[in-house]
Amino acid sequence: AASAASGMAGSMPAASEVEEVSSEVRVLPGEEGVVMPIDQGSLEEMKTGSYKFAANISSVDTKKRQMTLTVYGYDAYRAEDVDALDVGSVFSTHLDGAVEAQNVTVEKIEKNEENGTVSINGGIEEGGVDLWRSGDIYRTVTYDDYPVYYMMGELVLPVDDSVTLSDSSADVDAVPVETSGTIEVGKAVSEDKDNWTPYNTTVFTKDGAVSNILRIWVP
């Protein structure tokens, strides 16, 4: 999986995982013997909690002070769980970004400790899975170092009055354009309506309300 693995030692894309802002790592419940991903929280929990997640923003209703968006997650695993994988092991993953997770049996596995990558069943080039280590977790990785995103579902969330947007999507060297307030942020979203995607957009929430949006340049 050279094309997926090359350049992985670089920095992680800023559009990032769904994660509770102050949480300890816990894995999802699953069948006995199946390695499960880290629990990223449910859509229900996101309505009241403090999270950051990759998102596709559809619209901002400035009168109602609400944002409609689709939340995207990706699979990440505890390092010790991935380190223990071997031929015959079974793990749960959203293969190719499928909405439903499925159990995959490891038929072949290559571990590269130098660059922190693990290629399972030939990696993404052969319909398998590539993982990349970052700290104490491994996450799925596809071309251009992105995670393999899968859709978690749509949410309509309140927008904090003091919401901020930091937008450096214009080009690779763009200085971030800072915008604040529901009306101004809503205007910025509607002026570039189809270009808020999980690959460039990270949404931060506080107690269930959108507090900050980060959009980066992507090639």
Language-model segments: residues:
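Gram-positive cell-envelope targeting signals
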Residues: 1-23
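Solvent-exposed hydroxyl-ligand-binding patches built from regularly spaced Ser/Thr
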Residues: 18-219
